[in-house]
Amino acid sequence: MTRKFLFLFIGVFLIGSLAFSQEIQVQELEHKNPLAGVQITVKKSKESIFTSSEGKANLSIFTEKNDLILSLSGYQTLVLTWEQLEAKDYLVFLEPSPFTLQTTVISASRWNQNALDVPGKIRGLDRQELFLKHPVTTADWLGGSGEVFVQKSQLGGGSPMIRGFSANRLLYSIDGVRMNTAIFRSGNLQQVISLDPFAIQNTEILFGPGSVMYGSDAIGGVMVFETLSPDLENQSFQGNILTRYSSAYAENTYHLDFSFGKGKWSFLSSASYFNYGDLIMGKNKGQPSYLREQFLSRQNGVDVELANSNPRKQVGTAYSQVNLMQKIRLQISKHVQLDYAFHYSTTSNVPRYDRLIEKRDGKLRFARWDYGPQRWMMQQLAWKMTSATPLYDEFKLSLAYQYFEESRIERRVGNPIEFRREEQVHAFSINADFLKTIRDKNFLSYGIEAVKNRVSSNGETTNITNLTLSPTSSRYPESIWDSWAVYSNYSAELSTQMKMQGALRVNLNSLEADFTKNLSYYPLPVSSYRDRYFSLTGNLGIVFQAHPNFSLSPLISTGFRAPNVDDMGKIFDSAPGTVLIPNPSLGPEYAYNAELNVHQQIGGIVKVDITGYYTLLDHAMVRRESTLNGQSQIVYNGQLSKVFALQNASFAEIKGLQAGIELVLHKHLLFTSRYNWQKGKEELDDKSTSPSRHAAPAFGTSKLSFKKANFQIDFHAQYSAEVPFDQMPQEELSKPAIYATNSEGNLYSPSWIIFSLSGQFQLSPRISLAGGIENIGDLQYRPYSSGLVSPGRNFHLTLKGNF
């Protein structure tokens, strides 16, 4: 009996020791601090795990005993065998990487994948930079990358421009769920600010129309956001708290997130509050027209134009915002995981600054022009299963519901009638994604997607003197927009030096619209509309890696965008004295893209990446003069306005160059620079051409970073080239309020460069301090196409604690 107990004890001890030995501990080399979020994968397997806040992870989920790969942004990727891991007693150290351009794992195929295997250009943003860079919104987070140009009509906004495209020609993905709706606009789009920058875990920008796994309408690219998630390894209560102040914004920001787990359950909560005052512009150089010398005030029932005591204060830009997020994870078994996520964002009323500064005969036009609260809510239920079957090795199912609400409130000076138009969108989506490894280093990912949008739109006027309410025309027809898609991506290793990747997407879109509510206001040509659009898009690329430090990647791809409700059915004053009307004959547009990506690393000192691309947009949807019932002008909101409609032009084309360089000057000193040049043109009615509106001027960033121990400081420059009058897009020439004038009195957008200094210091293991000076020279500048003048010299300070 004693012998049996002895054997039993030894067996239990060995099993326990084996289980214990499967737990890896990852630390940073210099200070031996634990590293959280390290991704651990096994070669020839798509399964991955992440280290906890204590730098630990359980390796028992890996059945394959191939080499382990440990990767974390900002650190050198480590590959080691299981024998080497055992020899290190399961304690591993990662060395800081001198380079930041590399992204070890990306989600171009909707699954984690090595960036070296992807032929297209992808940029991952380092979350560790969030604390240092002080992005006011997620739009600023993207703009700080040096890869995305951001237009702002108001402080509570930010419309990204990528490779000459913007708005509904770009696609947003939140935790794998499509954010784009049927009313995403063709002009400038502000929805990206609904996402809390402090709740973002990973950000990736997939450039060009080759991102068929996310949507055929991603003409310019896809912005992929992964938000913070619960950590099953964390069984304790922990979190972060942050407060931030900035002078030019009169900002007060507060953020809290915390997580905890118990057994198979884990939870994460996040909340942020942002409050901004009227933005202060710079005082040096600039233009007299940039100053806010007057503003409107309602006094004793009369609109009064008042002198601004501080013309650099952009009266009518203040707003606030709240973001909430809750996630719950249940590890049902070793191979099955269930996740629930809730997101909510709302703003206060957001004054549209570019409209508030419009003048007619030297007098301000609008007494009020606000976006009502921009609300976004998403609920998602995701099921993930890992189990080797003939059809898949991994499977993900996502069910999501999103609610969007937006409104516009406007009133002209001296007119008691206030117009309010409000829209709601209910968006339902299903995604099923499968991953199958084929013959070791080849894999196939495929899936299906179904999306349904229900659009409701209403219009109302209020007489502010007697509060009388009356109906008026709505912005959109009552509509239903559907999308069904099947997509696949195949990645193969053709040789040790060459990899191939190809993808296909079959998409069917349908649109139904009912214009009945607006027929009493405008003689529209139809009372209802119904159409379907079928598309087949794809991409094919090769990664040729002749040397470990050099790769050449050609890629061809196509895109397709069918008209949505905003394109086809909108009634809106798109510019002063103009009105955009529905066009039921509007057809889809087709994109054809070719690009070449080159990566070169010279020793451990220099790293360069260059991308050249060309995109042809056939049957491009552009604004052109039109008529309604034979009339070239109609009365809209009480003003005689010239009629325009979106129509299919013969073509539009974009060509460009993207370049980046990193230079290690010292083990603690790194220089980085990114530069983007793009030119676009579109055909006009008379067969002449005009520069494309969303092809931003050349822009970029350069940065010198010093990082040592618990201290980092960055000196960086951000710059943009001039858009002279003869290169101004025709559409922009109708917006004199937002552009400077040259010596001949013609509109143009001046070049600019600003310098900023930022730093962060780890005061203790639990307290960090960050701060800096933005726009040190206090330059007065307005980025191309923006109504908002950018902030002047801005002092910002952030205090962060963790527990």
Predicted regions: what is each one?
Residues 27, 31, 39-43, 71-75, ...:
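Short, acidic, small-residue-rich periplasmic hinge/interaction motif at the N-terminus
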Residues 348, 403-407, 461, 508-521, ...:
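Surface-exposed extracellular loop regions of Gram-negative outer-membrane beta-barrel proteins
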Residues 495-496, 508-509, 613-616, 634-729, ...:
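Gram-negative outer-membrane beta-barrel transporters
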Residues 317, 423-434, 483-485, 581-587, ...:
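Outer membrane beta-barrel strand-and-loop segments of large Gram-negative receptors
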Residues 249-275, 286-349, 375-377, 438-439, ...:
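Transmembrane beta-barrel wall of Gram-negative outer-membrane proteins
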Residues 89-93, 136-141, 158-161, 173, ...:
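N-terminal periplasmic accessory domains that precede
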Residues 179-207:
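Short acidic/polar hinge/loop motifs at secondary-structure boundaries
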Residues 315-321, 331-392, 403-426, 472-478, ...:
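Flexible loop and strand-edge segments within Gram-negative outer membrane beta-barrel domains
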